[in-house]
């Protein structure tokens, strides 16, 4: 697996060169390392399904790449109902909302997406 070890690594020098002259701040993702990390998770999963946590990757395109990298990745664990509705509107399926919600706007958005065929599972706390 490729590694990044900080300012002394060859990757750091490559990043500095690639970003020279760019207006900062910006987001830069080494997709090779991202997918290597995903492959490592798959290898350690023992074949068990892995649900991608959206709060760890806030970029839809990167989420799509990780999900497509292995059939072991199955669905997305969303931070909020609103986020689940947003992801469903952008073609994501098999969504689970990690935290209970009573936000009427977010719940209406989820219901609208479910009416259009989205699969969104909401969690609840039972007293």
Label every model-predicted segment.
Residues 1-10:
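N-terminal hydrophobic targeting/anchoring segments and the immediately downstream early-domain regions
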Residues 4, 22-36:
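N-terminal basic, low-complexity leaders that serve as flexible interaction/assembly modules and, when applicable
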Residues 9-14, 80-84:
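Short, acidic/polar
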Residues 10-27:
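Generic N-terminal amphipathic, Lys/Arg-enriched alpha-helix
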Residues 35-38, 111:
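A generic alpha-helix structural signal
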Residues 37-45:
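N-terminal signal-anchor module of multipass membrane proteins
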Residues 51-127:
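Active-site-proximal beta-alpha core segment in soluble small-molecule metabolic enzymes
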């Amino acid at each position: 697996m490729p590694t990044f070890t900080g300012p002394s690594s060859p990757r750091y020098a490559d990043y500095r060169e690639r970003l020279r002259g760019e207006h900062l701040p910006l987001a830069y993702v080494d997709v090779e390392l991202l997918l290597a990390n995903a492959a490592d998770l798959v290898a350690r999963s023992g074949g068990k399904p892995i649900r991608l946590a959206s709060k760890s990757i806030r970029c839809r395109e990167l989420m799509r790449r990780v999900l497509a990298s292995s059939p072991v990745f199955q669905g997305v664990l969303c931070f909020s109902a609103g986020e689940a509705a947003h992801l469903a509107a952008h073609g994501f399926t098999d969504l689970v909302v990690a935290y209970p919600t009573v936000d009427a706007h977010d719940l209406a958005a989820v219901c609208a997406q479910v009416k259009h065929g989205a699969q969104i599972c909401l969690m609840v706390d039972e007293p």
